[in-house]
Every structure is written in C-alpha cells, then in structure tokens.
Amino acid sequence: MATGTPAHELRELNNEELTTRLREAKEELFNLRFQAATGQLTNNRRLGVVKRDIARIYTVLRERELGLSTNPGGDAA
C-alpha cells in the first residue's frame, strides 16, 4: 500500500531537510509521470501519494513562514 509521510513527521524536520525531501519528491513525481506516459507505471496510486506529500511539505514550510509553527532546527527560515 502506498502511504505518504504524515504531517507531524514533516513538522519534526528542519527547513533544510524539508527542502531536500521536496526536491526528492518532485524528482519522483517527474519519473512517475514519465512512466505513466510511456505505459510503464505499475502503481497508479503512487502518483497521488507523492503529490500529497509535496503539498504537505509546502504547507509545513508556509506555516513556518507565517509563524504558525516553529522550526525544530532553531534557525530562522
């Protein structure tokens, strides 16, 4: 079963780790879209899961930008 990363786990990461996760998720989404276009995608559900993970990461970063949550690393955005 394809499951994403819960938001509470993302909130425990610092901004640098979140940015790394975001880059990795975008790369995975690109590869999944390429597989879908060529008919090689075996797990269609993974596309939606990765999209939601990207949205969660953006949400956590925006919460920190607005001061709604704190950065566990202690450094400013």
From Swiss-Prot:
GO terms for molecular function: structural constituent of ribosome. GO terms for cellular component: cytosolic large ribosomal subunit. Keywords: Ribonucleoprotein, Ribosomal protein. GO terms for biological process: translation. PANTHER family: 60S RIBOSOMAL PROTEIN L35/50S RIBOSOMAL PROTEIN L29, LARGE RIBOSOMAL SUBUNIT PROTEIN UL29C. NCBIfam families: L29. Belongs to the universal ribosomal protein uL29 family. This is Large ribosomal subunit protein uL29. It comes from Corynebacterium jeikeium (strain K411).
